[in-house]
């Protein structure tokens, strides 16, 4: 088989990510419930706050923490309590120190793929935070290179292609996000393998779009062995 270049996303592709954020959100919504707002409204306030913070501060737990604290203050108003703010900080600290839960079939599939192809881990987020997750996952040895970026735009994809001299027809992006993995990869001319995750972050969802590259959809990461 021809040796390909596989760009592999991390969060919700190699290990669980969003499920831990959702668990923290459930605790947060319970915290603000006494203020009488509908949960949908509280989530709307949080989503808007988070959107603004992502634009200013990027992705990651620290940006998420800022959004939770600011949303709490907006919802609590004059009823805000220092103990509640400390509880939010405690939630975030617990989230930050939660070790990656590697998804079923990932280690053996990476071992198989890395014996046949060039492997690049390609993930977005806060640099130190993502690097720590990669190290704690124990998966770094399967990759020839690790790329951590603040966002996954078409420009960033093209820069990665140029940096690693990827022949587009022989390059594949493997990921769980249509918005940040699959669509921009296809639009830059790469091929893409979509591995959907049941609990992908809502901001990651989008309609799959066509592009110059091929699109493959597999039901699990383990299923990649049937195609590569």
What residue spans do the PLM features occupy?
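Asp-based, Mg2+/Mn2+-dependent phosphohydrolase catalytic module
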Residues: 1-4, 107, 111, 118, ...
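Long amphipathic N-terminal alpha/beta scaffold segment
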Residues: 87-107
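Active-site neighborhood of HAD-like aspartate-dependent phosphohydrolases
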Residues: 1-45
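Conserved phosphate-coupling serine/threonine residues in phosphotransfer and NTP-handling enzymes
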Residues: 123-125
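An amphipathic alpha-helix signature
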Residues: 21-29, 65, 69, 127
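A metal-dependent, Asp-based hydrolase signature
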Residues: 47-94
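Short, surface-exposed acidic
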Residues: 33-48, 77-88, 142, 169
């Amino acid at each position: 088989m021809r040796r390909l270049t596989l760009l592999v996303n991390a969060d919700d592709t190699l290990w669980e990510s969003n499920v831990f954020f959702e668990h923290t959100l459930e605790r947060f919504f319970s915290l603000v419930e006494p203020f009488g707002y509908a949960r949908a409204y509280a989530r709307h306030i949080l989503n808007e706050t988070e959107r603004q913070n992502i634009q200013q501060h990027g992705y990651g737990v620290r940006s998420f923490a800022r959004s939770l604290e600011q949303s709490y203050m907006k919802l609590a108003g004059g009823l805000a309590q220092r103990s509640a703010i400390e509880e939010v900080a405690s939630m975030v600290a617990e989230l930050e120190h939660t070790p990656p839960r590697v998804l079923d079939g990932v280690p053996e599939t990476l071992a198989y793929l890395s014996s046949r192809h060039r492997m690049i881990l390609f993930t977005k987020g806060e640099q130190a935070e993502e690097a720590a997750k990669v190290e704690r996952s124990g998966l770094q040895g399967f990759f020839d290179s690790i790329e951590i970026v603040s966002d996954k735009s078409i420009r960033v994809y093209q820069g990665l292609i140029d940096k690693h001299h990827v022949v587009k027809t022989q390059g594949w992006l493997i990921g769980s996000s249509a918005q940040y993995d699959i669509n921009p990869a296809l639009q830059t001319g790469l091929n893409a393998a979509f591995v959907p995750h049941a609990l992908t972050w809502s901001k990651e969802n989008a309609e799959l779009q066509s592009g110059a590259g091929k699109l493959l959809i597999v039901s699990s990461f383990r299923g990649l062995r049937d195609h590569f």
